[in-house]
């Protein structure tokens, strides 16, 4: 049993490895899909698998250089209008990659994987900059760009890999070292956000048993379903109603 205090923050060397490995895992999953599977609808209502992959590619390539990142957010801001900038950014990513064949999309994602992992974790000054993010409940949080680069972008690709597996019925390739580390980091943030005692047993290769305080609720669920619930993909009640950004 692990207390949440024992779950250390993801270090920059870890972040680089997790980012590169997660993109490679997405490439492996997408590269094995049939034409029919590319057209399946996902848990993101506006996207089929093909559109979701276009977003992921846009995010991967968009964080391989400062000029590219700035241009992406400027274009996304224009598309968003009065709405959240991130919605415009994701729409821009899908639009810019919709002309690619699925083979081209996968090849470009594979080529950019190590570059984006390196660039995201070498931004010593940029990582300190604040970034305002609108949450699903309408509140606005201030994050650091380091949190975006080293945590959120990897979580985003990871959750979309889960989305693709859900849409296609494919079995996720999960390991304790990679997926378990991502899930543990989610557990630690979830615990900080709700601040209440609990014992949580997460089953599956990415799972573990976590605790905080005493006398709290006891929860048991699949590790992937836990994260899907916290990401808003599935309904949650009690402590599982506390969402975590992905």
PLM features per residue range, with description:
Residues 2-54:
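An N-terminal domain-cap segment
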Residues 22-25, 29, 59, 112-115, ...:
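Amphipathic, well-ordered alpha-helical segments in soluble domains
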Residues 213-246:
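C-terminal interaction segments
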Residues 97-154:
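Internal, conserved structured core segments that host functional sites
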Residues 39-80, 132-193, 226:
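Short, contiguous alpha-helical
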Residues 32-38, 122-128, 166:
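Surface-exposed helix-capping loop/turn segments at secondary-structure junctions
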Residues 1-14, 62-117, 121-122:
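Short, helix-capping/interhelical loops that line the mouth of catalytic, cofactor-
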Residues 179-211, 215:
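An amphipathic alpha-helical core segment
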